[in-house]
Amino acid sequence: MPEGRSITAAELALLDPDGTFSSRLAADRDVLTGLARDLWTAPAESRQRRLAEMEGLAHRLGGAAGTFGYLTVSDAAFELEARIAVRRGEGESPFAEIEDRLAALLGTLEEALRER
């Protein structure tokens, strides 16, 4: 599939014949929401562990969503992953950018789930 082109319904049917990928999107949304709950008030060790889990999930979701034609979800997931990685290198920097990227990803997941 050329970069930037969404897959067609026929291509999606070949990739996801039983249509269960949207269930994964919903499950990933729920996990991200749980990881984010009270994240910034959690003890530092717990916060770091949860951010690492969120980063890994964002990476996996970014790749899978792109494969299944959810390009906006893929882009938002990779943006969240990148922001978490940058923050790790900066130490205890402001969290607003991570919160913004997470909100954007959750929004694209909601939109994708409504459309499918």
Q: What is each residue range found by the language model?
A:
Residues 11-14, 43-47, 62:
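A short, mixed-charge helix-start or loop-turn motif at secondary-structure junctions
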Residues 24, 42, 68-71, 90:
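Residue-level signal for short amphipathic helical patches enriched in basic/charged
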Residues 46-55, 93-101:
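Glycine-rich, flexible loop segments associated with nucleotide phosphate handling
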Residues 1-36, 87-116:
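Amphipathic, coiled-coil-like alpha-helical segments
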Residues 48-86:
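Extended, amphipathic alpha-helices with heptad-repeat/coiled-coil or helix-bundle character
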Residues 34-52:
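Helix-loop segments that flank and shape redox-cofactor active sites
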Residues 11, 40, 56:
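Residue-level detector of functional hotspots within protein domains
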